[in-house]
Amino acid sequence: MAETTISTANRVKQWDDKAHIEYIRANRFKRYMGSNENSIIQVKEDLTKKRGDAITIPLVGALDSSGGPNTGSSDLVGNEKALPNDGHRIPVGVVRDATLVNVEEEQASPINIRNAGKVALRDLQMRYLRNDIIGALGSINGVAYGTATTGQKNTWHDGNSDRVLYGAAAGNFVAGDHAASLANIASPGDALTGDLVSLAKRTAQDAVTVNGDGIRPFRYGEDMETFVMFVNTKAFRDLRNWMVTNKFWNDAMQAGKDNPLFSGPTSIHWDGVIVREIPEIGVISGVGAGDPAIDVAPCYLCGAQALAAAWAMRTKSTTRKEDDYGFRYGVGFMEMRGVEKLQYAQGTDEAKDWGVVTTYVAGVADA
């Protein structure tokens, strides 16, 4: 009797799929990722099934309601409404890395160094993805914040004037000058508080969108809506201290438990916003008010389709072929993906961040 055996290729594929799912699930941003237009981070895997070096995410605005409906007193033919739409193109590229060990070192190690290498590689994948998401949140019209020129920052600043906030007052915004606006942020007056979170939420609701009603929130349940704000440790500290001082802390922790975006001690629920601590979000050093100038912490209030992550190739395990007659063992991973903040009118001076209100607050170090 002949028994069926699973081919090596199929075994590897099963391991690859498991590794991909585990690495996505363990990622700090996982609960905000999903495949539909309601997700904070929309995931697309269309290119895993067909050729291409980029994927376009459709962005659809609301139909214009300003003129009211057709009441039957005139023909509808010829008076149909155009559906506002655009698309954000996300190029994909290779992301890979590997680790190498030889037989002698493996023998000397008290741990299973090969398995440890796989675990370490998965952690590295998660850090790469996390860093790319953080970089996308802070990007200036597709350019990394740290490398964007003054002119590029000012163009983004003016183009997104209805969805960028400098400290606790809308008046801190200086037209045409991103740096001067940052210099208006002071401590402690512009530290993150519940009032400032509420201001950021109102900014999202009032943002000028394509025939719409502000930045679209994440929806859950029958009619519940929420935003999520990603903040660094210093901003999270200031908000927590404000809530404890004003005796809001316990109520806020209880209120968030029914929200699918709430993540326990690393989240604070306030006024329909889940504020999520992401320690790896850095500060912009020495750009705020004062002498010396204080550090400023960027915070990102996000609605639906704030970002997108596109995969052309899921995580694939790789091994080194050049093994020096079995003396060296190399294992790695490879995937093809891209992560970007979505924009309407991408690539133009009128480009707008589709689902993000960027909020800059005081980010001073602990005393």
Language-model features: where?
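Sequence/fold signature of self-assembling virion shell proteins
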Residues: 2-18, 22-34, 38, 156-367
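Generic signal for short, ordered secondary-structure residues
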Residues: 36, 78, 99-100, 144, ...
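Long, contiguous amphipathic alpha-helices that act as assembly "spine/axial" helices in icosahedral shell
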Residues: 57, 85-171, 219-235, 323-335
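Glycine-rich loops and low-complexity Gly/Arg-rich segments
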Residues: 80-85, 115-116, 123-126, 253-258, ...
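Short, low-complexity, polar/charged sequence segments that are solvent-exposed and flexible
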Residues: 75-79, 109, 117-120, 247-252, ...
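Assembly/oligomerization interface modules of large self-assembling protein complexes
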Residues: 36-97
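Residue-level detector of alpha-helix boundaries and kinks
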Residues: 42, 105-107, 316
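N-terminal low-complexity, intrinsically disordered "leader/linker" segments enriched in small/polar
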Residues: 9-63, 113, 132, 138
